[in-house]
Amino acid sequence: MPKRILQGVVVSDKQEKTIVVKVERRFTHPLLKKTVRRSKNYHAHDETKAFKIGDTVSIEETKPMSKLKRWIVLPAAQAQG
């Protein structure tokens, strides 16, 4: 099964080697037929501390690294390609 890749915005970089990424998804509400936005925060591993608040990043699913961390940040060159 392929690993999931999501794109989002960094909302926190205060932890050591960890960033919090807000990922937004859009879907059509089944009853109201209106586009709804929902967001979720993911803790991702950032080994180099290269990303700051407001940066757009791609994260990839990986094995659990801690209680909350199950994602790693993709390098900028790989994220765009």
From Swiss-Prot:
UniProt-listed Pfam families: Ribosomal_S17 (PF00366)
Highest rank taxon of the organism: Bacteria
UniProt keyword list: Ribonucleoprotein, Ribosomal protein, RNA-binding, rRNA-binding
InterPro entries in the record: NA-bd_OB-fold, Ribosomal_uS17, Ribosomal_uS17_bact/chlr
Gene Ontology CC annotations of this record: cytosolic small ribosomal subunit
GO biological process, one term: translation
Molecular function in Gene Ontology: rRNA binding; structural constituent of ribosome
PANTHER family cross-referenced by the UniProt entry: 40S RIBOSOMAL PROTEIN S11 FAMILY MEMBER (PTHR10744), SMALL RIBOSOMAL SUBUNIT PROTEIN US17M (PTHR10744:SF1)
Quaternary structure and partners: Part of the 30S ribosomal subunit.
Cited function: One of the primary rRNA binding proteins, it binds specifically to the 5'-end of 16S ribosomal RNA.
Name assigned to this protein: Small ribosomal subunit protein uS17
Organism: Methylocella silvestris (strain DSM 15510 / CIP 108128 / LMG 27833 / NCIMB 13906 / BL2)
